[in-house]
Curated annotation (Swiss-Prot):
SMART domains in the cross-refs: ACTIN
Lineage, top ranks: Eukaryota, Viridiplantae, Streptophyta, Embryophyta, Tracheophyta
Protein name: Actin-related protein 2
Keyword Cytoplasm: yes
Gene from which this protein is expressed: ARP2
Alphabetical UniProt keywords: Actin-binding, ATP-binding, Cytoplasm, Cytoskeleton, Developmental protein, Nucleotide-binding
Organism from which the protein derives: Oryza sativa subsp. indica
């Protein structure tokens, strides 16, 4: 089977990344949104003809005429009907494939309900009639993209952040940590912060604009208190941004206040540990033989780890915790700890890249895939092939 017949699809909360096995970057990346027209005009407001359902990037251009819904929330598919439209768009419009002649590798966030995975596999066989399917945990794929089999993956996308220890290609679900703070929540928090500054922002209409502000201007402070003090006493942090309608707004301390929610989720009323705490606790809960290896291979993955300053902040916080909890303040022990955080430049699509690598290697290995025949004979029991049924 040639690589053109193996589809890799990473459906995230914010974007769907899809393409073919063995590729170096996704053929298509489009927002995971579905829009339905609010008004049925005989003549539409713009030149663009409104079809019944709009998927992906087209929603952004027409968002004033659409009721927009997001089928995936926090990495879990909530609306299977909408997800069907997204997959239709991916397979038929973007990749232009005939599913019955292809195999597909799908990705699944760790700690996702088994029901989600069952429904996914059911849809792939019953609706699209794929020849073979495999579902892999996202964190493991991120490591494959780095050429590793053992490491601690910190994956933060648009809807969910998780920290997963992987040893020899197997993840540990009982030690995996998950936090429902990621890109979308930070954008939403930035909308609130800008509103407090006096700019009239709307949660839905301006969401995309604020997301662009976030991607261009936000960063993580090395020391939050000192940075905040600097922001209060000087104007050194203030940057201007021109909105699509021509207004210019000034963004100051909000630039690092918004992403701070990744480390201090209480800022947006989410209980639980921040990113550094999760990573530290995750490694300390592993058996002692694997801890040092995990400290040496902390791999960042996903779009919400792209903030400037995030790797150095994470390193600082983890060293502080190690010094405090493990070494009880004895600084000499730090020399033995080789903490290494890997932040590959293309980590935004890392799960997809790992999927393309895995699918490329396995495309001719029949024992790897769940075939249509196995599905028809065994039903959902065939999920055990994915190792997590």
């Amino acid at each position: 089977m040639d690589s053109g017949n193996v589809v890799v699809c990473d459906n995230g909360t914010g974007y769907v990344k899809c393409g073919f096995a063995g590729e170096n970057f996704p053929t298509s990346v489009f927002p995971c949104v579905v829009g339905r027209p609010l008004l049925r005009y005989e003549e539409s407001l713009q030149e663009q003809e409104l079809t019944d359902i709009v998927v992906g990037a087209a929603c952004a251009d027409l968002r004033h005429q659409l009721d927009v819904s997001y089928p995936v929330t926090n990495g879990i598919v909530q609306s299977w009907d909408d997800m069907g439209h997204i997959w239709d768009h991916a397979f038929y419009s973007e990749l232009k494939v005939d599913p019955s002649e292809c195999k597909i590798l799908l990705t699944d966030p760790p700690l996702n309900p088994v029901k989600n995975r069952e429904k996914m596999i059911e849809t792939m066989f019953e609706k699209y009639n794929f020849a073979g399917v495999f579902i892999q945990v996202q964190a493991v794929l991120s490591l494959y993209a780095q050429g590793l089999l053992t490491g601690l993956v910190i994956d933060s996308g648009d809807g969910v952040t998780h920290v997963v220890p992987v040893v020899d290609g197997f993840s540990y679900p009982h030690i995996t940590k998950r936090m429902n703070v990621a890109g979308r929540h930070i954008t939403s928090y930035l909308v609130d912060l800008l509103s407090r500054r006096g700019y009239a922002m709307n949660k839905s209409a301006d969401f995309e604009t604020v997301r662009e502000i976030k991607e261009k201007l936000c960063y993580l402070s090395y020391d939050y208190k000192r940075e905040y003090q600097l922001g209060l006493e000087t104007t050194i942090l203030v940057k201007s941004y021109t909105l699509p309608d021509g207004r210019v707004i000034k963004v100051g301390t909000e630039r690092f206040q918004a992403p701070e929610a990744l480390f201090t989720p209480e800022l947006i009323d989410v209980e639980g540990d921040g990113m550094a705490d999760m990573a530290f606790r995750c490694i300390q809960e592993m058996d002692i033989d694997n801890r040092m290896t995990l400290y040496q291979h902390i791999v960042l993955s996903g779009g919400s780890t792209m903030y400037p300053g995030l790797p150095s902040r994470l390193e600082k916080e983890m060293l502080d915790r190690y010094l405090d909890v493990v070494l009880k303040g004895n600084k000499d022990g730090l020399k033995k700890l080789r903490l290494r955080i890997e932040d590959p430049p293309r980590r935004k699509h890392m799960v997809y890249l790992g999927g393309a690598v895995l699918a490329g290697i396995m495309k001719d290995a029949p024992e790897f895939w769940i075939t249509r025949q196995e599905y028809q004979e065994e039903g959902l029991a065939c999920l055990r092939k994915c190792g997590q049924a």
